[in-house]
Amino acid sequence: DELDRLPEGDAATGLTRERWISLVLADLGYGRVPPTPAGGLVAGEGAAAKSYPVSHLWGATPIHQLGWNVDLDRRTRGLAGAARAPHALVQELLNRTDDYLWAILTNGRSLRLLRDSTTLTGFAYVEFDLEAMFDGELYSEFALLYLLAHQSRVEVAEGQAPSTCWLERWRTTAIGQGVRALTLLRAGVESALETLGTGFLQHPANVDLRQRLADGTVRPTDVHA
């Protein structure tokens, strides 16, 4: 195993990209993903501009490719693209600009699909365990990865906003359906409570309760949490 022959502490970035990540991305339709210019990607303008050392960019989708031995949630001192926690780096980039809405972050072990989360208090992402997926031949997991992370899901037509990609359209539709489902569920719960409450009060054993409700001794709020 080539990874085992690397010196201790080697991030294995080049090996991981060439021998593994490039193959996974090719299977997902990205082909050879172009590297970003020196310094990475820039968010903001003028004095507010800030550079983010993200390694690659496919269309409007940053794809930060790191080595097998790089932790995605912790900084790796002295390593380009990981001098601060890679996940936090990519998330901040998405949050600071409208140029990118979705991004991919991977070290070969796992692949994360991130989205701009300025309206949320935490991170918004989906993670795929590539190591377990391929070692365990988990075809259903790969099918899900293919469904969500294929290049056609994040592809943006020339001159269009990142929000026009299929992945964002699906997200918008899912949110709308979820709101409608909650509205229907709320109405159903209210109807069920009214039916149960009416039946409870009409039961012959509850004559005393009906009388106490009628004369105000017991209020509806006393029996409804």
Please name every model-derived segment.
Residues D1-E8, T61, Q65-A225:
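Short, basic/polar, glycine-containing "phosphate-handling" surface segments that engage DNA
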Residues D1-L28:
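Charged, often low-complexity linker/regulatory segments
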Residues T13-G14, P34-P35, V54-S55, H64-G67, ...:
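Residue-level signal for functionally critical sites in structured catalytic/ligand-binding pockets
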Residues I21, L28, V33, H56-W58, ...:
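Generic detector of bulky aromatic hydrophobic side chains
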Residues V24, L28-G59:
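Active-site metal-binding core of divalent-cation-utilizing nuclease and nuclease-like domains
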